[in-house]
Amino acid sequence: VPLTFFPKKVPGLQQAFRLKDGAWRMNLTVEALGQSVQADVFHLYSLKAGAAYGSVLMNFFVVGAPANEWRISVPAGIGNIDVSGQNVGRDWRREGDVVVVPLSRPVLGAGTILLTFEQPMCARGGDISPGEVRPLGVQGERGYVQVVSPLQVNYDISRSEGALLKLDPSELPAEFRLLSSAPTLAA
């Protein structure tokens, strides 16, 4: 029986069966599934004189077993880090190239955090590698990268690897385009 047709709502109901007569029997094999975490990530980089300012919004979806912490890869050249979000206190820490974010309550289902940072750059320009701030220990990651600047700058995408697709700025979802009023350089 489809769960939507079950006459009484029961929290946590996963299977329902209908009996056609009194002589019935069933064997059920049950297997506990491990934790699976999917991440939707939006990287926003704003280029200004002497620095690139980054905001990385991470939406996690956890099934199987609750998550007690988030682990995020952050390159060494990135500083002035701040982390905020659901169930996130001030006790996050940096361990080398990893930011460890303990959660005040374990998360099962959806969880969101925002990691902001600065990456120093020469006032005349320099190199940045958007997308290097990434969630660790996830089974799947997808998302968007947007680079904006209120300044007039020349830029060149010197290298693009993997499953990264260049987008026209109008192809970014509207909810992400609204996060910056500066012109988009690359998406």
Short names for language-model regions:
Residues 1-187:
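Extended non-catalytic domains of envelope/secretory-pathway proteins
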